[in-house]
């Protein structure tokens, strides 16, 4: 069976970007890069194959108009689903009202599965692949995005790259003693390495969550928790973490999410002896995320949350030859 023009274009995007993708993986993972590259390539192919036809048509449209999100008529709104409508189904009923307001961009605050009540407003994620049951289902989210698209409204969701909730299945497996999943996080038997980190790494919330590490009584280990004790930092030195996270991003894109606000992105790579902020490896990961999205779902836009000094911001756009984020978000500017 002959490949469609859309399929051929996907093949061309993969071929064009494979060399750079492998180089970036090698930069981060050395001898593990080949396996990571195979896994990531298979993920991109399977995610593209699973992408709904209407979203592939949107990809084609956006490729012809790559700066669509910069148009002067873009008008956005941010809201909590439950406060505005109750749940995703009820929000879908309000799409005609949003269209009447000339809305073209809707940012829904975190709605993926989270622990209750302690969840940092949804930024402690228990499952990157599932809508929180209090708000609906994945099918409800897909139905909402379809209705929004028909009304000319693009949906933005947060994606928390730096950490998971301590109740995430990976963290639970780590707590149960599984070394595979302990390597998804930063876990230490004693204070030797944590003390070395603490000597140079500033605290994010010194008043409300002092310290960068939390003792897990179940594991009898210290765990890196840059934000709150119930948010465990992911270990991107493990290529399985990167591939797993990218799988979740692509899954949400295939539900119709058009913009991802990637949360706390400057923090995602840790290097002993540094302040663990804005490291070169962070930019390598963001560049890979951009490449993967451009290959599989080029309609999707990246908005990086970079709450750092203004001099740090421009680097997150990347370069014209190797772009990273399409847009940046800084609450202090």
Where are these regions (language model features)?
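Short, intrinsically disordered, charge-balanced linker/junction segments flanking boundaries
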Residues: 331-333
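Active-site regions of oxyanion-processing enzymes, predominantly non-cytosolic
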Residues: 252-253, 258-262
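Acidic/aromatic-lined carbohydrate-recognition and catalytic surfaces
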Residues: 1-243, 254, 265-327
């Amino acid at each position: 069976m002959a490949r469609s023009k859309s399929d051929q274009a996907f093949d061309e995007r993969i071929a064009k970007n494979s060399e750079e993708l492998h180089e970036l993986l090698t930069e981060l993972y050395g001898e593990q890069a080949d396996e990571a590259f195979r896994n990531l390539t298979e993920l991109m192919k399977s995610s593209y194959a699973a992408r709904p036809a209407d979203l592939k048509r949107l990809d084609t449209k956006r490729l012809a108009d790559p700066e669509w999100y910069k148009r002067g008529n873009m008008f956005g709104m941010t809201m909590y689903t439950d406060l505005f409508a109750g749940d995703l189904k009820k929000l879908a009923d309000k799409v005609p009202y949003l269209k009447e307001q000339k809305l073209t961009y809707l940012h829904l605050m975190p709605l993926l599965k989270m622990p209750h009540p302690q969840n940092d407003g949804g930024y402690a994620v228990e499952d990157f692949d599932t809508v929180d049951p209090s708000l609906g289902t994945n099918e409800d989210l897909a139905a909402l995005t379809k209705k929004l698209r028909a009304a000319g409204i693009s949906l933005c969701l947060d994606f928390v790259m730096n950490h998971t909730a301590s109740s995430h299945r990976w963290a639970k497996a780590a707590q149960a003693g599984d070394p595979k999943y302990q390597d998804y996080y930063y876990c230490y038997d004693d204070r030797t390495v944590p003390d070395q980190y603490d000597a140079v790494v500033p605290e994010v919330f010194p008043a409300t969550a002092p310290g960068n590490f939390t003792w897990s009584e179940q594991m009898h280990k210290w765990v890196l928790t840059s934000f709150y004790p119930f948010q465990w930092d992911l270990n991107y030195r493990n290529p399985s973490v990167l591939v797993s996270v990218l799988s979740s991003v692509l899954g949400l894109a295939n539900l119709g999410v058009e913009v991802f606000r990637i949360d706390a992105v400057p923090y995602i790579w840790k290097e002993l002896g540094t302040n663990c902020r804005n490291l070169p490896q962070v930019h390598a990961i963001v560049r890979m995320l951009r490449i993967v999205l451009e290959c599989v779902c080029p309609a999707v836009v990246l908005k990086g949350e970079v709450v750092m000094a203004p001099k740090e911001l421009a680097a997150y756009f990347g370069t014209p030859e190797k772009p990273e984020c399409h847009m940046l978000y800084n609450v202090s500017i």
